[in-house]
């Protein structure tokens, strides 16, 4: 039972939130009790009533979580934060169980993908097949089934995406109880079997793939967490990235061209399986990855150190095996690892056992005995410290491309695109852009964006504060070249000569 201490006088927001929390918990408990009673022999009507209770509980819990923490008295904020986390777990459990019940009473129910409920992992509760009942005649049986389906569609069409995920589930668990976060699974991995997935259905966010096929040979808990790392269409295209021409060409050869005619890219023409993007911070490495995700028709995994590491012994290796197995099941696919040096730095005797095993597992899965020459998996790594990577890691990235600081032409292009994107080019001419680009030598892409933002603030600072609230945005004067001179007094290059010297040395020795 969740108990709230009584709030101080006047803390109306706290009282309202506490009451909503309590109501949601009570409704959730009632739903679970009815679920327990009807899970084996309950009628369709009873199951639909259980679904209604889960919907009501989820609605109350969702309302309870819609508040501003700053409206809560400071002495109660810690308490509310703890209860908020618990209630979010309950809301997730209610949604999962609601999906399972809708699948039980009518597995064929379909629901619009524009429902208000966001995507979630498959229901952890089991699908219980309703027991067959006798009917005096086939006509009566069919009529009863049609009536049940109509009632089920009525329940499942009022805001919850009951049929959004049609994942096969097992018959081991019966109902969902409020539970703590999932801990490391110690179950052995299933025997790995290659599954051919219809490539026309990829990527998953554009046309749903059979999740059971993707998760074949993968621990379910780990697999569902990895599928959450699939990067949706970002809206970024290669043309949006200024400069970086060599990196664009390499990515086009490895990703886009083979998709147009795979038969041409076999044997010696087979695309590389590893591309390392390195360079000073803020020069478009991650943006290029987003552009690849936006233009390719492949499943794109956006992986960071936190996605692979775990405090539980053995979990990191399981996660890496699961990542590459899902990528094989869905190939062609792309794995992007940002700040790859944080997990694959040079191995040494000082490494912890967990770290050493994780690095070894990654290298084996990337290009080892378990990999195949026919695998169409591209691994893209991004780092600004390539000299710290292990030699075995570098060997697996035959394309090592440096994204250098933008030259004057690239700076002109980036400044122009940034200002046009925000409709702020009216007060500037081409000679102004050339002047700004010529005075920003050593600036990275992110430095130039920061410079544009600072210049855009100069006209705002000229407005009297007493008139600021009544000023129309369209009446603010246009940005001038002199505003960039003012901005240059505060915005400086963020890349030091020491960093550039190290990166240049690495590029001469190992770069393409």
Swiss-Prot record:
Compartments it resides in: Membrane; Cytoplasm, Cytoskeleton; Cytoplasm, Perinuclear region
Annotated phenotype, changing residue 339 to Q: Abolishes enzymatic activity. Abrogates microtubule severing, promotes homohexamerization and promotes association with microtubules
Topology versus the membrane: Peripheral membrane protein
Region (Disordered): 110-182
Basic and acidic residues bias locations: 137-163
EC id: 5.6.1.1
GO biological process, any: microtubule bundle formation
Enzyme class: isomerase
Region (MTBD): 115-233
Outcome of substituting residue 266 to A: Does not abolish microtubule severing. Disperse cytoplasmic localization
Stretches of the chain found on the membrane's Cytoplasmic side: 1-274, 295-512
Effect of residue 285 to R: Abolishes ATP-binding and enzymatic activity. Abolishes microtubule severing. Forms homohexamers
Effect of substituting residue 357 to A: Abolishes microtubule severing. Disperse cytoplasmic localization
GO MF terms, alphabetically ordered: ATP binding; ATP hydrolysis activity; identical protein binding; microtubule binding; microtubule severing ATPase activity
Domain of life: Eukaryota
Catalytic activity, reaction form: n ATP + n H2O + a microtubule = n ADP + n phosphate + (n+1) alpha/beta tubulin heterodimers
Function description: ATP-dependent microtubule severing protein that specifically recognizes and cuts microtubules. Probably by regulating microtubule remodeling, plays a role in new synapse formation in GABAergic DD (Dorsal D type) neurons.
Entry domain remark: The MTBD (microtubule binding domain) region mediates binding to microtubules and tubulin.
Name of the protein in its database record: Spastin homolog
Gene that this polypeptide is encoded by: spas-1
